Amino acid sequence: MRSMPVVLWAVLGLLGGCARPGPSPAASGPANAGLPPWPDRPRASAGEAFTRAWSDGRAELSGYRARVNRYGEMREGELVLIYVTEPMDRRTWVKDDAVAAPHRVGVLKLNASLRFQTGVYPYSVLTSVFAPVDRYRDEAFAPVKITLSVQEWCGHVFHGVWPGDGRAAEQVMSYFAEEGERRRDVATPGGTLYEDALLIQLRELDGPFAGGGDWRGSLVPSLWSIRRAHRPTAAVEATITRSRAQRDGAEVHRFVLRYGGYTRTLDVEPGGARRILGWQASDGEDVHLVRTARLPYWQLNHNGDEGQRALFGLGDGGEAPDGAPRTPP
């Protein structure tokens, strides 16, 4: 079994702007208590094309205009999808620039940052997906951890899921009395997918999704949808069909996700960076790409760096700049 290419290991070690310096943490305590086991070895290493594209020491940031449904009304908001590679310690599934083999696992991290207003108060939603770049499961980029944090004026909520074989570990910390703080296991049949990870997997960055065909099986809905519905986390039967379609005069790969009475249609670039161009959902959600940039964003935290936001479609105040193309060349 080939190990991850050396160049990607080197770059993962450099992406430390969001890390705290210091020694590696011990593999004990709440961070790894009860985590499901993960395969010792990958089935295949990350491909050379993926490694070349994601070894430039930068993150990919895409800004979107979003309409989301909350409290029965549509809200205008902004969404940023941030993709970056980084190393994790497989004993705890936390980022660690200093961890060495055999505990070091390179992942592609997606941070999905959603902001919108509900009347007098704002909502801030951050979903993080951590997916190894080497293939450990049937489907590439199977996640090892998914977390959601929601902040609004009533309070804040954390929801984490750690997928494994036959089960996923779940932790919820909520200001709601009926939810409180709890840990439990969620049954997940073999081959279960996670809706939050589809924003990585459907990009087909290292080979076709579902072998290039349609998919049917078990899926855990997005943590944000679970949060809004105040329902327990559970795997549901779902389908994903694919086709070629037209969007703004250009050909796209179109994926349609269906489960229960819910439908979500996602359009993806068929080549190049394979960006998520947008999606529409049966609950009225409507998301459109504005602009994409590759930046070492962790270095752009000084006064005056606010102007860099326009490079990925957001103005200084969080709005898309006038005339910004929705799907840039």
Annotate each predicted stretch with a short phrase.
Residues 11-12:
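Residue-level signal for mature regions of secreted extracellular proteins and peptides
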